[in-house]
Curated annotation (Swiss-Prot):
The lineage of its organism: Bacteria, Pseudomonadati, Pseudomonadota, Betaproteobacteria, Burkholderiales. This is ATP synthase subunit beta. The gene is atpD. HAMAP family: ATP_synth_beta_bact (MF_01347). F-type ATPases have 2 components, CF(1) - the catalytic core - and CF(0) - the membrane proton channel. CF(1) has five subunits: alpha(3), beta(3), gamma(1), delta(1), epsilon(1). CF(0) has three main subunits: a(1), b(2) and c(9-12). The alpha and beta chains form an alternating ring which encloses part of the gamma chain. CF(1) is attached to CF(0) by a central stalk formed by the gamma and epsilon chains, while a peripheral stalk is formed by the delta and b chains. It comes from Burkholderia cenocepacia (strain ATCC BAA-245 / DSM 16553 / LMG 16656 / NCTC 13227 / J2315 / CF5610). Its EC number is 7.1.2.2. It catalyses: ATP + H2O + 4 H(+)(in) = ADP + phosphate + 5 H(+)(out).
Length: 464
């Protein structure tokens, strides 16, 4: 450690998670330098230089017991976390310290959590599809390998369950390494996830970084960067890595909490004025280069189910595929509650997914859109007033709607029905049969919570 690392300062003000520290004028810390409280492990991160030797910092940990006059040392470098294989199978906090009581992490390599995004000429876009085994996603909003996916939804519509199923289906089949960043989510979910990974013997391929709801805003603001730094290291070593974030909204919210304490004027709906920049800095780093790829799945909480809220609206622009979860569909008992008319993907292009897949997707969406338009008429006048073509459209749309539901492996404990993984070919074949009218004679309840179309035929026999 250099001599500058030993420069000491004194705390001059504490307001919640924001601490002001005074240093000698000729050796002020730089922005993002990590400061350590003398005699403890508490870390502060420099956010602003106020002049006269005073810097404003965010406390990455509880600020209980801090007072004016305490000594703080400057490490003269940003927060660095351990990276590489020793992090696999471990649970770490925002500073890369283990919190799973399984001993220290013996990694020789550390890396700063603040990195520049890769240069444009290093990027490597991919059109290779990533099969998830979830019918509605593979059909309507297919994922690309090395792409970015957002799961948007309000409270309680199934973002975390969908993400767990994706981890279950992709991470277990994938064989490569995964990084999971729990940003401001429930501790219970983090615990469940750890045991789920352990029971399915894939824990040795996953690095877990948690900054849960009960932690100070500084931790929640930086934990996504810690997880991303670990994923970037695997990518730069030439590996294909999966990066899961639950939940990006809490990252924004932590920024909002900190922003007000730093004395910035709030912007729309009380968010920080630097919302777009903070989101951009994070998202631009989650990308695939010529060395390796990062495929990321991010859960995005939508406050009050309003997709125009600045936080989800800012996230939309950075993603390759958006999976929108709808409360209306969840209220019908159809899970996963993905809205097939609102969800989109850049991969929906006949040159990428093939002519057959493209045409089936569009026909399914047209049928569902027609049903949506006719719903008001049906509510007022009933089905009898519709033309024969419209009656057929409605019947097929209701079958499609039910066929888009699917039992999940991770929900077996709650539902009692075994989870289903449906290959893409089977998904396309099933929906093709419905829109071509080959299933018109089957009752619509036969399509609810089944895997392939063959299961729907079997279920219909039992019903009849």
């Amino acid at each position: 450690m250099s001599t500058a690392a030993l420069v000491e300062g004194k705390i001059v003000q504490c307001i919640g998670a924001v601490i002001d520290v005074e240093f000698p004028r000729d050796s002020m810390p730089k922005i993002y330098d990590a400061l350590i409280l003398d005699g403890s492990e508490l870390t502060l991160e420099v956010q602003q230089q106020l002049g006269d030797g005073v810097v404003r910092t965010i406390c990455l940990g509880a600020s209980d017991g801090l007072r004016r006059g305490l000594t703080v040392k400057n490490t003269a470098k940003p927060i660095s976390v351990p990276v590489g294989k020793p992090t696999l199978g471990r649970i770490m906090d925002v500073l890369g310290r283990p919190i799973d009581e399984a001993g220290p992490i013996d990694s020789d390599v550390t890396r700063s959590i603040h990195q520049k995004a890769p240069a444009f000429d290093e990027l490597s876009p991919s059109t290779e599809l990533l099969e998830t085994g979830i019918k509605v996603i593979d059909l309507i909003c297919p994922f690309a390998k090395g792409g970015k996916v957002g799961l948007f939804g309000g409270a309680g519509v199934g973002k975390t369950v969908n993400m767990m199923e994706l981890i279950n289906n992709i991470a277990k089949e994938h064989g490569g390494y995964s990084v999971f960043a729990g940003v401001g989510e429930r501790t219970r979910e983090g615990n469940d996830f750890y045991h789920e990974m352990k029971d399915s013997n894939v824990l040795d391929k996953v690095a877990l970084v948690y900054g849960q709801m009960n932690e100070p805003p500084g931790n929640r603001l930086r934990v996504a960067l810690t997880g991303l730094t670990m994923a970037e290291h695997f990518r730069d070593e030439g590996l294909d890595v999966l990066f899961f974030v639950d939940n990006i909204y809490r990252f924004t919210l932590a920024g909002t909490e900190v922003s007000a304490l730093l004395g910035r004027m709030p912007s729309a709906v009380g968010y920080q004025p630097t919302l777009a920049e903070e989101m951009g800095k994070l998202q631009e780093r989650i990308t695939s280069t010529k060395k390796g790829s990062i495929t990321s799945v991010q859960a995005v909480y939508v406050p009050a189910d309003d997709l125009t809220d600045p936080s989800p609206a800012t996230t939309f622009g950075h993603l390759d595929a958006t999976v929108v979860l709808s409360r209306d569909i969840a209220s019908l008992g159809i899970y996963p509650a993905v809205d097939p008319l609102d969800s989109t993907s850049r991969q929906i292009d006949p040159n990428v997914i093939g002519e057959e897949h493209y045409s089936i997707t569009r026909r399914v969406q047209q049928t569902l859109q027609r049903y949506k338009e006719l719903r008001d008429i049906i509510a007022i006048l009933g089905m009898d007033e519709l033309s024969p073509e419209d009656k057929l459209s409605v019947a097929r749309a209701r079958k499609i709607q039910r066929f888009l539901s699917q039992p999940f492996h991770v929900a077996e404990v709650f539902t009692g029905s075994p989870g289903k993984y449906v290959p893409l070919k089977e998904t396309i074949r099933g929906f093709k049969m419905i829109v071509d009218g080959e299933c018109d004679h089957l009752p619509e309840q036969a399509f609810y919570m089944v895997g392939t179309i063959d299961e729907a035929f079997e279920k219909a026999k039992k019903i009849q």
